[in-house]
Amino acid sequence: MKIVVTGTRGIPNVMGGVETHCEELFPRIASFGEDVTLIRRASYVNDGLTEWKGVKLVDIATPKKKSFEAIVHTFRAINKAKSLGAEVLHVHAIGPALLVPYARLLGMKVVFTHHGPDYDRDKWGMAAKMILKLGERMGCMFANEVIVISDVIKNLIARKYGRTEHVHLIYNGVPSPEICDYPEYFEELGIEKGKYILGMCRFVPEKNLHHLVEAYTSLIRNEELGMRNCKLVLAGDTDFEDEYSRGLKEMARKNGVVLTGFIKGRKLHSLLTNCRCYCLPSSHEGLPIALLEAMSYKVPVVVSDIPANLEVGLPKEDYFPCGDVKALAEKLQDVVSKPLQPVDYYMGKYYWDKIAKQVDEVYQSLRH
């Protein structure tokens, strides 16, 4: 089956939850014998690749503008998919889903994966939020098959659009952990094993990393808590440097926070292997891949109590009220004060091999 994928910036090694999802999923789909082409945004990749792990890669130039790059790229990608003879177009995220009806008019069968209500993100203005909501509507009403990554999203589209048929709950996955040390990298960062809190995500407002920095700062300033030897490491960056990301970085540097930039591979694996705990204080998520990845390393986690995080099913003591910096600080202090022990989380729903088979079954249903 000829499958063309759009709605992602690209793979491999491109920052973002949808990008991580596609990087894990589509090589597995290709290994089943499917003919998979993924269309990338040229401004995010410079590796010259035309194929990666069995997935064909096509780069299309798109203006790198936050407000309209996704829709321009999707329009061009749909036209390219038609010229490639795509039997199935797989569209990721609600912004690109705005053009699902166009793809249907061109005769393609469409699978739409809803990764979360992006219009809830703080970074979007009113006009962008309206377009994203329209994209969600178009995807849910006109796609042949809809994949949702959480029960929260499944219930949302049933309530808003009455879409209950041809809807498939298929979770995000997490790869097997790569346990490793990287002494030279730790020396470069000025950190020690087991003596740092890790925040790992994009530097955008809804991730609430400023709350994490505020909570950490309040702890290290209180000498009675004995937190001065514990560092805070923020691994990540932003696609579009803006007032928020610049302010966050400046705030972090002033308070001794370690900034790694966007990292993958051994550097990231070593940070996950050796952190004291992982923290995700966000106000918006679909199903957080970064949290699942931290859980796979059996490290303690502290996360906000938003619906997407609650759906992961962590113990009650791992959650704090979203936006409550004092409660976050108390949770971090409590975790750091306890002896470090590996935590066995239930990860059965999040195996990528299982997830890939579920997605391929959706494709096969379109043969009929």
Where are each of the predicted segments found?
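Short His-centered aromatic/hydrophobic patch
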Residues: V91-P96
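A short, active-site helix/loop in glycosyltransferases that binds the activated sugar's phosphate group
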Residues: C140-V167, V174-S176
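Short hydrophobic beta-strand element within catalytic cores of glycosyltransferases
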Residues: P300-V303
